[in-house]
């Protein structure tokens, strides 16, 4: 990962001013480079990122194509993008001052891209050392315009691959002109929207649980089997396919597989397959967590679900569930 250029524009919606920086950020300053690069690296692998494709009528796409052909400078591109964002967001019901970070980068595969981050200003407090006739003392002071820390996510962002102009983005709904919209795909970028890998997995799991419960099957067992398939996608680098997830979860049960397939067809927002960030797939697929209505929480490897030597679920005559953990040599308090 390498940050090539970056610029920070200020979108002051309170005063209706779009303050364009006339200079790029100085990336030779370690603090500046660290903030920008870590912001890019963290968001680039965010499993919550949705994907999309520009519509042919997108003005932003035309600007990016001009930039990619070197007929537009980075400064000119960043200025144009900032103006487009400002014009789209200035009519939102609740608008705070937002810094727009525009960066040019190369990823691990040396593919060039442009990234935009919406960094909503926050209030922060710190101390100041003061001196008066009584001596030295400290005082608490407030800062009104503070960038989000690196442990805090940007409220919205987009990555654009300049080789094929594909998109990855995260956005939140905003009230603009009385309507709740996702401003990035609908107003600014003008692109399609496909659920993120994380969203697709969660929706598929919810659908799977519903089918299992309809047939009186333990959804925990079904989900644990499905998660083994999810873990395999991390190992092989293949896309996540909800249909294959259901087939793995209901292996050997054609009736449940058929019902799941029908419900999947009805769920039009769930894609047939989607790329899932490998670290999310591995973390989510290899471990299963459950919480009972009695307040007990259990975390166990998903693969153990098919091994009765480690864990078993039983339905008692009164309809309640029992969980038996086996082969335990030692219990450690945490």
Q: Which positions does each model-derived feature cover?
A:
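C-terminal structured domains
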Residues: 247-334
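Long, hydrophobic alpha/beta structural blocks
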Residues: 2-284
